[in-house]
Amino acid sequence: ACEMCISKKTIYKYFSNKDILIEESIQMVHKEIHETIDKIVAKNFNAIEENFEIKRTFREMFKSAESSPIYQLKKHYPEVYAKALSSQIEICEKCFRDNIQKGINEGLYRENLDVDNYIKFYYTLIFNINENTASGIEAEELEVKALEYHIRAMATLAGIIELEKHLNNPII
C-alpha cells in the first residue's frame, strides 16, 4: 500500500481480503506477460530473434528482482507462488512450442526434434536458474547461456548463423 501511495483501507474497499488481492494481482501479471509475448510474436521476428526479443523485454519488465512481483510472491506467499508458477509454466510451454514450430518451419531448427522434451529441458533450466541464483546479474548471464544452449541444441546451420548474430549483439 505504501509503495502505491494508497491506504490499506482503500485497497480493502475493492478487495475483501488479502488472498483475493493476491489472486487478482497474479492474474494481472499473467495477463501482462501474455500480452507482451503476443505483441512480440505479432512483430513477426524469426524464431531465434523472437527468443532474444522476449528475453530482452522480460529483463526490462523484471529488472529489479527484489521489487518484482514474482520475487515478493515467492518470499511472502510460497504456496500461492507455487500455484502461480504452475500456471506460468503452461503459458511458457505454449510459447516455447510455438517458437520451436516456427523455427522448424523457417529452417532455423532441425525437423526431427523431440519438441516435448526440448520444452521441458528449457523451462527446467530457466526456472531453476531463477529459483537458485541469488544474484540478478549472475541469473541474467546464466539465462543467456541457457538460451544459447537451447538454441544450439535445436539449430540447423542457418540457425547457428542467426544465433551467432544475436550473441555478438551486446544488447541481449
PLM region descriptions:
Residues 91-120, 125, 129, 133:
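Hydrophobic alpha-helical bundle segments that form small-molecule/ligand-binding pockets
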Residues 63-108:
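Short secondary-structure transition hinges
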Residues 56-61, 70-73, 148-154:
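Helix-loop "lid/cap" segments that line or gate small-molecule binding pockets
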